[in-house]
Amino acid sequence: MKNAVGRDIPEENLRVTGKDVFRGSHAMDGKEYRRDGARVKPVINSEGSKLLPSIKDALLKCEIKDGMTLSFHHHFREGDKVLNMVMEEVHKLGIKNITICASSMGSQNNPIVYMIDDGTITNIQSSGVRGEIGKAISEGRLQGLAIMRSHGGRVRAIESGETHIDIAFIGAPTADEYGNLNANGGKANCGVLSYSAPDALYADKVVAITDCLVPYPNWPHQISQIYVDYVVVVDEIGDPSKIATGAAKPTSDQRKLLMASYCTEVVKRTPYFKDGFSYQTGVGGASIASTISLADVMRERNIHMSFGVGGITKPMCQLLEEGLARTLVDTQDFDEYAIQSAATNPNHHYITAGEYADPFNKGAYVNKLDFVILAALEVDVHFNCNVVVGSNGVVSGAQGGHPDTAAGAKCTIVITPILQGRIPSVCTDVTTVTTPGEDVDVVITDYGIAINPKRQDLMDALKDSGLPLKSIEELRDIAYAMTGEPERVQFGDRVVGIIEARNGSIMDVVREIKPFQFAD
């Protein structure tokens, strides 16, 4: 069955999942539903401590069994140690058929890939997956399905009851013996615990894992004791030095700096760039560089940002410190500078993942965005974006807040080089659609800028800018002239993953890859 972005979704997947095809970003606006609830065992009179000696003890107390759903956050990014630690204990107990519901997974989780092969892990729900686990999914080694959701879509799935968490594990930089948790004040700080908030609220059991036990009460807390069942102290929950890895680094690449300068020129010419504008940037090098160059224009024009939101980086914190931004509302910190800012700056505020991007609450922060600056692996001539599946067909990225912010912002700008290596980034059709073209307004490459034709207002604002404006088809043709039109990735018939739209409908499917075969 064809959906609103032209992807054919197999009827079998619609039947098995009970989902509808994607019918547009705002198709479910105003739809009423009833939130799910956790199973709660009241603690009316206790001994005053929830401490347990080990993760194994916590698993046994939570009555771990085959077929359960376990959840984790990824605030430590590639420095996370909690997910692997817990799953090793699950494996030792001989538990099978586990669904992992993680806010994201990466190469730090490579050591548990064997648990996919032996049936310990049979389903994965995540923003995305990188590394060996992504490869295992694409090769069809996961017995069940991998469901990739945006950050907002994950909250929606949990609170609607579509995903019910049996046990949530929250790696907490500090905790007291009664379960008040904070992301700061310990030896492995991560700034915020935003992705754990829905898990704490809706999971049947919640286990805090910390390497820094502090006196009661741990105040201020980001996760309250009223949601936590048990606390376990371990040697090490994460390595903060590995938070700023991969995408989350500034750049000195001249091509990326050129695209950042184009981005600044676009932003400053739109009607939204005025005192009190709101802004989010991604963590790609060009996106971070665009924040730095935009600050010069803000100083020149005496324009101040009302709030910056989302994943926070050092340049955003520096805008706050300088007074160019009034407030930061934070769901994830991408470097140690941002972590320190979250702990010390009174105008740097923690918000939950639901407050940030949940499409099924009564209004998330993304709805109030003027600008969002994003990256993409691929953009097609329909302005659809792919941020999850690589050009080789392997799951190697994450939706993150990409679809959420694109849907909410008044001006969504996607920055991507015309080529990624020798692979065109602008193409006729993306390998997999993760963000629909209806939500993308401007595409910036190192060879020119394309404006979505439906945004005549932006075309008018930029027509005399002197910028290298081109149609999206022209950008594709430039890319193809350099490399030739690439061969399409060859997939098998089996669907191994689902790309969910943020509202829970099916945007696209991911099929099992098969060895490349040359045409006769």
Please annotate each region the language model reported.
Residues 1-520:
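Conserved alpha/beta enzyme-core scaffold
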